[in-house]
From Swiss-Prot:
Organism: Mus musculus
Self-association and partners: Homodimer. Component of the multisubunit transport protein particle (TRAPP) complex, which includes at least TRAPPC2, TRAPPC2L, TRAPPC3, TRAPPC3L, TRAPPC4, TRAPPC5, TRAPPC8, TRAPPC9, TRAPPC10, TRAPPC11 and TRAPPC12. Heterodimer with TRAPPC6A. The heterodimer TRAPPC3-TRAPPC6A interacts with TRAPPC2L. Heterodimer with TRAPPC6b. The heterodimer TRAPPC6B-TRAPPC3 interacts with TRAPPC1 likely providing a core for TRAPP complex formation.
Keywords on record: Endoplasmic reticulum, ER-Golgi transport, Golgi apparatus, Lipoprotein, Palmitate, Transport
Expressing tissues: Widely expressed. Expressed in lung, heart, liver, spleen, brain and kidney.
Name of this protein: Trafficking protein particle complex subunit 3
Entry similarity comment: Belongs to the TRAPP small subunits family. BET3 subfamily.
Gene: Trappc3
Length: 180
């Protein structure tokens, strides 16, 4: 019995490592394809956005989470359910703005950066920028326009990885004329 449980853990670890290495290969290829880090950062954000737009359906189906009533509830669902479900981590939520429209997600351990060291000639690269795009894309599909950006990164010598989230506005559904 314990042997099977051990296989499941090993399989999950191998799957996680394969994902990390595959993501690293993707970023490496983007660095070769684009001339500067800013273009790579934009491409990672765009790719993440497209993933988020599709991932939200899977998330809603698998998590049985209902509609969030405010940005604080949304932050809790992102940190405690979504990150746990897809990356196996639970970031902490800190640094709320007084207005309640901004917060930080603190990742003590970012699984995307395992085995990674940024070369000196890529100091402007935001290696995990895909995550910001995923957050923007997924939240847009549930009628929330947000800004997501990295403000700290362990790859750049910071103690933790921090993603700053800012609520911009609620997106209204605009139905085509004649459809309601």
């Amino acid at each position: 019995m314990s042997r099977q449980a051990n296989r499941g853990t090993e399989s999950k670890k191998m799957s996680s490592e394969l994902f990390t290495l595959t993501y690293g290969a993707l970023v490496t290829q983007l660095c070769k394809d684009y001339e500067n880090d800013e273009d790579v950062n934009k491409q990672l954000d765009r790719m993440g956005y497209n993933i988020g737009v599709r991932l939200i359906e899977d998330f809603l189906a698998r998590s049985n989470v209902g509609r969030c009533h405010d940005f604080r509830e949304t932050a809790d669902v992102i940190a405690k359910v979504a990150f746990k479900m897809y990356l196996g981590i639970t970031p902490s939520i800190t640094n709320w703005s007084p207005a309640g429209d901004e917060f930080s997600l603190i990742l003590e351990n970012n699984p995307l950066v395992d085995f990674v060291e940024l070369p000196d000639n890529h100091s402007a690269l935001i290696y995990s920028n895909l995550l910001c795009g995923v957050l923007r894309g997924a939240l847009e599909m549930v009628q929330m326009a947000v800004e997501a950006k990295f403000v700290q990164d362990t790859l750049k010598g910071d103690g933790v990885t921090e993603i700053r989230m800012r609520f911009i506005r609620r997106i209204e559904d605009n139905l085509p004329a004649g459809e309601e």
